[in-house]
Amino acid sequence: MHADLSGTVAVVAGATRGAGRAIACELGWAGATVYVTGRSVRGAPSPMQRPETIEDTADLITARGGRAIAVQCDHTEPEKVKALFDRVRAEQDGRLDVLVNDVWGGDPLSHWGVPFWEHSLDDGLRMQRQAVWSHVITSWYGVPLMVERGHGLVVEMTDGATADYRGSLFYDLAKASVIRLAVAQAAELRPHGVAAVALTPGFMRSEAVLDHFGVAESNWRDGVAEDPHFAASETPFYVARAVVALAADPDVARRSGQALTSWDLAREYGFTDVDGSQPDWGTYFQQISNS
């Protein structure tokens, strides 16, 4: 699959690491001008306490001839999000083709293995602001640029495309709410020519996941000894290529309002993961659930 997004403009909110970083890279490598946003900048890491920064993401894009603009932005703060889109409007003549809402920041706020009434209420509520309200704020300021031109795509990144319980009330609420954001935005944007979808990866080998297993991407299969399910995992670039395929699809409106998966879109559009494979977490998970 080769998509040409030359001349398009994208904002990837939450592009510091993981899926957001890969999405920004794939969009930039396909020719889009990409605004790479997040909290972590060189010399000032976010509360995630990870080494990745938005400048690093931008450098990955420009190293391959792409155009990337790193903008520090806390997407829970409306005035900062407004300033971001004011800048996009001024620098890109009001153009915005793709908005990816991938802000999360909920890992330090998630407490697994406890019922919700024993989970920190403060952390649970903060998670909703970090992972849900940040998306609302970002779309509220960004979508008008698309509506004005009668064209655009909003991608709401989530975890899981079904109504199945996700292991913790607060985590489940955040991820399910993001799907509903896509559904609701799609309904209100449809008359204006703008599409909105939710999109999930499978078991994704993010930087943090690789660190957890004590492996690098080059030897990731060593992690299968600790967790056999890791064999069905995928890189962040797999779901990123799904975003590029959607952005390049002139008939993407038919997908508006849907919750999509990396593996289903790989079959439809024909893209692969970086190693040429097409991981299918959905089928794998169904098989182990039925066994």
What are these regions (language model features)?
Residues 2-94, 104-117:
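Short-chain dehydrogenase/reductase
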Residues 8, 66-67, 94-96, 146-160, ...:
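Active-site loop of short-chain dehydrogenase/reductase
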Residues 22, 26, 141, 188:
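Rossmann-fold NAD(P)-dependent oxidoreductase module
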Residues 49-50, 114, 191, 203-230, ...:
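A glycine/serine/threonine-rich, flexible loop-to-helix segment
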Residues 105-109, 117-123, 127, 153-191, ...:
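Catalytic loop of short-chain dehydrogenase/reductase
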Residues 139-140, 183:
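A short, exposed helix-loop element centered on a Lys and neighboring polar residues
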Residues 198, 217-291:
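C-terminal helical subdomain
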